[in-house]
Amino acid sequence: MALTELRIASRRSQLAMVQTNWVKAELEKAHPGLTITVEAMATQGDKILDVALAKIGDKGLFTKELEAQMLVGRADIAVHSLKDLPTNLPEGLMLGCITEREDPADALVLHAKNKHLNLATLPEGAVVGTSSLRRLAQLRHHYPHLEFKDVRGNVITRLEKLDSGAYDCLILAAAGLGRLGFADRIDQSIPGDISLHAVGQGALGIECVENQPDVMEIIKVLEHGPTSQRCLAERAFLRELEGGCQVPIGVNTRFEGDQLILTGMVASLDGKRLIREQASGPSTDPESIGLELAATLKGLGAGEILKEIFDAVRPEA
């Protein structure tokens, strides 16, 4: 018997709700007789705003509470920013589908006084706000003259902190700014040769309980094949490196004919060591490409860099 009701678990931040409501609307359009409800909640990552993300511990910071709802039967699916979803999921849960990716790039948002500048021309000591070790490490590598300061809170809160003068600029995800209607705040889309984006950035991941064919039948309309191939390669790369959402691992994927080309990067926190390589293969076997690239980077010393980082940012007791 087909499902008549679908329950969605979501974070309650403004961006999360925009994303979840988009999923809800798309599913309602595809399944007119389906009743869809949303349960919004705060996650650990939403509640702890006075500690850097990497110091809290990065496994499921923005997902555990949503997953718990599914595991006890109170939700059928959870909507995540795919970049926040760990590569190893709790037993009984699975990544059901991946939506079409929006712009995965990192974006520079400047304070009004700096609108005539860009990353390369910001003066010595300019304060850059970011909560991402990946962005921090890559930008330190290219722009060692800049100062970097942690910034927490939702997108609107971060923009308010920038506008108040606490920072000279922020680095944020272009996709998130666009979804919230702040695309006009983007002053520079940061090219991949400066900052490779996070695994899964720009896409949504729909997580669900395993062995639920009725649920899979409902959500399959959201699956975007090319995005899924790209993100599965990226997630395999991250999983094999045993990295999480808060480590300096960056990626980029692109198609050339029937080939998928994955570029990956691991950097030290100070930006002085940066290993970057690429791998390619048939787009029909994306995970093998990710595994191959991870092995290449490990052979070049990525494992040692990551161990140093894990030791340096080990969560505080």
Swiss-Prot record:
Task performed by this protein: Tetrapolymerization of the monopyrrole PBG into the hydroxymethylbilane pre-uroporphyrinogen in several discrete steps.
HAMAP family in the cross-refs: Porphobil_deam
PROSITE patterns per record: PORPHOBILINOGEN_DEAM
This enzyme's EC code(s): 2.5.1.61
Gene Ontology molecular-function annotations: hydroxymethylbilane synthase activity
Enzyme class: transferase
Residues where S-(dipyrrolylmethanemethyl)cysteine is found: 245
Record has Transferase as a keyword: yes
Pathway listed: Porphyrin-containing compound metabolism; protoporphyrin-IX biosynthesis; coproporphyrinogen-III from 5-aminolevulinate: step 2/4; Porphyrin-containing compound metabolism; chlorophyll biosynthesis
Subunit record text: Monomer.
Reactions that this protein is recorded to catalyse: 4 porphobilinogen + H2O = hydroxymethylbilane + 4 NH4(+)
Anything else known: The porphobilinogen subunits are added to the dipyrromethane group.
GO cellular component labels: cytoplasm
Gene label: hemC
Family under the similarity heading: Belongs to the HMBS family.
Cofactor: binding details: Binds 1 dipyrromethane group covalently.
Cofactors: dipyrromethane
UniProt name for this protein: Porphobilinogen deaminase
InterPro entries the record matches: HemC (IPR000860), Porphobilin_deaminase_cofac_BS (IPR022419), Porphobilin_deaminase_N (IPR022417), Porphobilinogen_deaminase_C (IPR022418), Porphobilinogen_deaminase_C_sf (IPR036803)
Keywords: Chlorophyll biosynthesis, Porphyrin biosynthesis, Transferase
Gene Ontology process terms (BP): chlorophyll biosynthetic process; protoporphyrinogen IX biosynthetic process
SUPFAM superfamilies: Periplasmic binding protein-like II (SSF53850), Porphobilinogen deaminase (hydroxymethylbilane synthase), C-terminal domain (SSF54782)
